Amino acid sequence: METVLSVLSSVFWGLLMLSVLVFLHEGGHFLAARACGVRVTEFFLGLPCRFDIHHTSRRIGTKFGVTPLLLGGYAAICGMDPTDVSYADRVLAAIYRHGRVTVADLAVELELSEEDVLEACALLLGWGSIAPWYEEGEKPSPGYYPTKYQTLPRDAAGYTTFDGRRFDREHATAEGDVWELPCGEAEFLARERSHTYLGQGFVKRAFMLLAGIIVNILTGFLLLMSIYSIAGVTVPVDTNVIGQVDEGSIASAAGIEDGDAILSVDGVSCSTWMDVYDAIGKAAGKDDIAIEYERDGKKHSTTVALKEDERLGVYVSTQVVRLDPITSARLSFSYVVQTAKGVMRLLQPQHTMEILDKSSSIVGISVMSSQAAAAGPATFLSFAALISFSLGFMNLLPIPPLDGGKLVIEIIQKIAGRELPLKVQTIVSYVGIALFALLFIYMLRSDILRFIL
């Protein structure tokens, strides 16, 4: 029973920490997309699932909610997939001519195959340009695209609810209404594309990709600053008073206890912890080291034998100090730099395996999260801050589908002056996913050997 509770505790704290941090990461992408005028159809805590609790924002049209698969979160930013369909403009125009129409009817009218029409509808659905149409009693079929589509509410300028403040709700059509395009089919499709990720320039695309990473780093930074300023940090006190004695240690066997003040070691007077440390180091290797100490105002003495490779088992006294904001910020920033250096070492072949052996998958993070939670809120939040840093910088690795991999593709396209062929991007993504999977399996194996077996 104890083992089961331990596992459940690890799973709970691990999922809680990762879900919140990934949700915040996706929140960065969401906010950046909205700031760039890009449509976002969904923003959820948890992975996509047919079962969810949600609320659709009347102001921006985005569906906010939570799913049972609490393994992170996601923001459905329109136009993230590098897909293009040559006849999407015709399909879009036809849907707005009819208001509501089936894929089969569109295929007949446009003299296209149903597969071609469905491909175009999937693209337009992902752009937030159309909506699925379900008649009374019908429900979405998991794993399948809808076969009937309808128009979205549009104002005179062509804006939809996904366009936020620019949408004139008072003078807009209703969902499923026929609406006349204000321009040609190709131009209207180009307008719709301008509200997607693909329709933005390099700077805005890079900003949207980096926003999640920035939020993770900022989250970790603020967490550490808060902990250092409010809860404080434990620092050593340079005094001869013992902070802790290891149970079963040489010092414990000699009768030395927590709170005893070491007066001398092997005849060397001690008034600070550095005096104690130096005296023990010099006396190591002797069989009759005399230690004089004070407890409750009374002096005591004892003798210990300490080999050169043995430890006495005493620790320095500590105290909790609340740091000022500047010192807290400086110390927090040092952790940011350390994490960044660690991730950079992962890219250096001579250090790759060393870093991977020290890294953890979700299993290791869950176990350590449970241990941190048991140690107290400050320890748990400190660990969460370090994981947030790691999550942010790991996403910078140039491996698709990570943000860093996508950014590399954007840089290549900027230098080349054109978009990479869809086939090339697809191949690169598959290779990246395979590499990412191998890294995960390796770290999972290490965690199982480290924490379970």
Roles of regions detected by a PLM:
Residues 25-28, 66, 251, 259-262, ...:
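Terminal peptide-recognition signature
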Residues 103, 109-110, 120, 251-274:
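Conserved PDZ fold ligand-binding element
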Residues 60, 71, 258-261, 285:
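Short, flexible surface segments
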Residues 12-24, 30-51, 60, 178-244, ...:
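Internal alpha-helical transmembrane segments
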Residues 84-112:
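Short amphipathic alpha-helical interface segments
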Residues 6, 10-86, 116, 120-190, ...:
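Small-residue-rich helix-interface/hinge motifs
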Residues 209-220, 382-396, 402:
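Pore domain of cation channels
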Residues 2-5, 174-207, 231, 235-246, ...:
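Functional transmembrane alpha-helices
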